[in-house]
Design a protein with these regions (language model features):
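Catalytic-center loop of serine/cysteine hydrolases
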Residues: 150
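Active-site catalytic loop in hydrolytic enzyme cores
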Residues: 1-58, 69-76, 134, 140-147, ...
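CN hydrolase (nitrilase-like) catalytic-core segments centered on the catalytic cysteine
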Residues: 41-128
Length: 158
């Protein structure tokens, strides 16, 4: 996956070129879409698709470098992406102080399609954890609230 939205405040646009395609991987029957950091702020880029009574993906994974001063935004957007896409969302964020003295508290977690936190890691801890996701619970939620049937169909030209 190539990161679509380059973080101008970090001068990424001077060192990298933006990606032009999305990737959805299949792992043990789960459709997974990886995204990077700043892409979280752009809901159109991560918009789940619903065609032929199937969703494009089941899990969004954001690997990120969000500083602690924006941790509330980070968490709010993860919740929003889970609700609007009827998918699990995992946010994996860095911990510690970077080379510029910017603090990162992590605030990593997994959110259910309802937006409810399923698993939250404690802030400021370098930790590795696993969480079992229920495909059955995901399908039940989608059947209960199948908003995909009413989503607008649109395309993005690059």
């Amino acid at each position: 996956y190539d990161k679509r939205h380059l973080f101008r405040m970090g001068n990424e646009h001077e060192r990298f070129s933006m990606g032009k395609s999305r990737v959805v991987m299949d792992y043990k029957g789960w459709k997974i879409m990886p995204l990077i950091c700043y892409d979280l702020r752009f809901p159109v880029w991560s918009k789940n698709k619903f065609q032929f009574n199937k969703y494009e993906y089941d899990l969004l994974i954001y690997v990120a470098n969000w500083p602690s001063v924006r941790s509330d935004v980070w968490k709010s957007l993860l919740i929003a992406r889970s609700i609007e896409n009827l998918a699990y969302v995992a946010g994996v964020n860095r911990v510690g102080i970077d080379g510029n003295g910017v603090e990162h508290t992590g605030d990593s977690g997994i959110y259910e399609p309802s937006g409810k936190p399923l698993f939250l890691l404690p802030p400021d801890e370098e930790i590795m954890a696993t969480q079992l996701l229920s495909y059955e619970a995901l399908q039940q939620w989608r059947e209960k609230l199948n908003a995909g049937l009413d989503w607008d169909d649109f395309t993005i030209d690059y």
